[in-house]
Amino acid sequence: MRVAVETQGSRWQDWLLDIDDVTLSPKPPSSGMDTDWSALDQIIERLQADQSRVRRISLKVVVFDDADLAYAKEVHRRYPGVPFYLQTGNADVADSDVDALRAKLLSRLEWLVEQAAESEELADVHILPQLHTLLWGNKRGV
């Protein structure tokens, strides 16, 4: 059995060495949180240095706006050898109209794809929507 985890990457946990797929998702400016770069550096360095198992490490930044996109570029520059994902954010967590929400999310996804296509820095990133939101909207418990 393979085990995957996603964490914001702000605090080292020894059990991360037992995980097969680790996605580090530092919080962008829109979250109101500050990134502890030294903690993130340490986590990535420790995971990469551990040769006891084959492990996939990746980074993901959720992008809501231009400031988040600039932050994502900074993260990608800082860790160029780590597979990198961009994901659109859902700012409208109260909307119960799934079709309207999907239209907004797809519009944001189109914007993000266009921004990445225009940026040489982001030529090798993977771009994803929030699949659970596209499927179920803001429904809880799914």
Language model region names:
Residues 1-142:
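Conserved AdoMet/S-adenosylmethionine-binding subsite of the radical SAM
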